Amino acid sequence: MSGVKRVFVEKKKPFAVNAKELLEEIGGYLGIKTITDVRVLIRYDIENLSEETYKKALTTVFSEPPVDDVYEGTFPAGNDDFVFSVEYLPGQFDQRADSAEQCVKFFNENETPVIKTAVTYVLTGTVTDEEKNRIKEHCINPVDSRQAAEDIPETLVTEFKTPADV
């Protein structure tokens, strides 16, 4: 049951309101006119879930089939696309992950899934390194978020060492 699975969920074009708004913000607020398209995907990293429960949750918990496209493991992106992900800092409450964990437990109450989420941005267009940094600064609130690593972790379980006596 262990082993981390990664799922990306993206709103279909007519329903991709967040992507459209971000494209307008990048062009209007940041003044970067060379971005021609923006995609926003929700990334779920999932561990401690049986294959049966995972398959059920894929189309009921993680996505809504009429409005979402689901990609397992990886998603299609152009070679020149600018891709980065944003996750909550350790210790910050992730409501999306918590809700997904609770919903998945309805399928099998004996499983204790560990789910972590991130938002992945895919920007199409020509941008300089300075413009990339400005876009990241716009999308990442340093108070509660950070840029996420793109590789799949070996485990999602966080081990905390017992502190020494004072």
Language-model-detected regions and their locations in the chain:
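Core nucleic-acid recognition elements
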Residues: 1-166
